[in-house]
């Protein structure tokens, strides 16, 4: 077995900077897009369709073809090239519907919008196909699809292709993985797929991996509470060294609190710092990706700590005496 060793930015998802609250919505979206371009974020165009549905006619009508119904979503937003690549990869095995956040929602976790309404817009992707954007989180997008917006269920939920790996502890932050989890909560088999940061993003290998995962899930099925997390190394299509089924590894975060002062003298803060690393222990997702292999990792919604469960049952759980409230 290899030694536990830190890996420099193993696809480091990193945390994305939040838009300052004093910006208008349109300015924030424009600056976010510019920042993504500076970072090399692969962005595909997605334009709004003209016209507005009449109230009461807002639900799309989808005919049943007999092919699997596949819901595709992500957390990078509807304009992401990774989303388009995933949609195109899965069209060969099912009827694909794209429902994704209208803006980048990286690292939002399993956030669900309950205190305001959600709005859905029809969008046209770069290949001319129809998609739907939601002004909420990845979880919102999946919830909307399962709660009746399309009037039918789903045979598979595919979330990605995320630009940046989601390895080890990343899954607790990841909107990509959380979208797949929301599918599982709604009894839909699901997987999440992410690719390491790549100087010249090419999602060919990740698209092939997504197709293989989808076919396996549709053929073999998943038990209740199960989903699959897939991570693809940043290598050319011909350079990867196979597929490995792994366990989750250990992410090493290097977050720093960065304080700044605005023109009015009021301090504000960013969460920044160097990219995270990870421990490339043999058998983990980190080890597989470092060695140019695609990591396929099973995940379960049941987060019960089994070993701690036994210990807790040996502790003294006698409560303190209730306070005397008599006058």
Language-model segments: residues:
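N-terminal acidic, proline/glycine-rich, low-complexity intrinsically disordered segments
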Residues: 1-24
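A cross-family phosphate/adenosyl-ligand binding-site feature
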Residues: 2-3, 25-29, 33-34, 40-73, ...
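Short beta-strand segments
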Residues: 73, 99-101, 135, 159-162, ...
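Alpha-helix C-terminal capping segments
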Residues: 145-151, 178-189
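Short, Asp-centered acidic motifs that coordinate Mg2+ and/or phosphate
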Residues: 156
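Glycine/threonine-rich flexible loop motifs
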Residues: 165-174
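Glycine-rich phosphate/pyrophosphate-binding loops
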Residues: 184-206
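Electrostatically charged, flexible surface regions
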Residues: 205-327
């Amino acid at each position: 077995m290899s030694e536990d060793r830190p890996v420099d930015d193993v696809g480091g998802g990193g945390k994305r900077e939040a838009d300052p609250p004093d910006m208008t919505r349109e300015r924030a979206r424009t600056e976010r897009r510019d920042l993504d371009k500076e970072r090399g974020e692969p962005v595909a165009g997605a334009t709004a369709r003209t016209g507005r549905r009449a109230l009461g006619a807002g639900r799309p009508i989808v005919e049943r073809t007999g092919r699997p119904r596949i819901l595709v979503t992500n957390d990078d937003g509807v304009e992401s090239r990774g989303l388009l690549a995933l949609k195109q990869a899965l069209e060969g095995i099912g009827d694909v519907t794209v429902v994704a956040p209208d803006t980048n929602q990286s690292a939002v976790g399993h956030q669900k919008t309950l205190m305001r309404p959600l709005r859905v817009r029809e969008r046209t992707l770069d290949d001319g196909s129809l998609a739907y954007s939601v002004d909420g989180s990845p979880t919102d997008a999946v919830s909307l699809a399962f709660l009746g917006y399309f009037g039918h269920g789903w045979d598979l939920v595919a979330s990605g292709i995320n630009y940046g790996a989601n390895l080890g502890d990343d899954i607790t932050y990841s909107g990509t993985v959380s979208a797949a989890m929301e599918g599982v909560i709604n009894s839909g088999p699901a997987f999440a797929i992410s690719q390491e940061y790549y100087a010249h993003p090419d999602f060919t290998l990740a698209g092939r991996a997504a197709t293989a995962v989808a076919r396996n899930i549709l053929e073999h099925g998943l038990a209740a509470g199960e989903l699959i997390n897939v991570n693809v190394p940043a290598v050319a299509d011909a350079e990867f060294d196979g597929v490995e089924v792994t366990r989750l590894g250990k992410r090493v975060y290097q977050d720093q609190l960065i304080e700044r002062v605005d023109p009015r003298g009021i301090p504000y803060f960013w969460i920044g710092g160097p990219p995270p690393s990870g421990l490339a222990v043999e058998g983990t997702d980190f080890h597989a990706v470092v060695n140019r292999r695609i990591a396929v990792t099973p995940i379960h919604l049941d987060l019960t700590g089994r070993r701690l469960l036994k210990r807790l049952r040996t502790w003294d759980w006698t409560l303190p005496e209730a306070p005397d409230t008599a006058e």
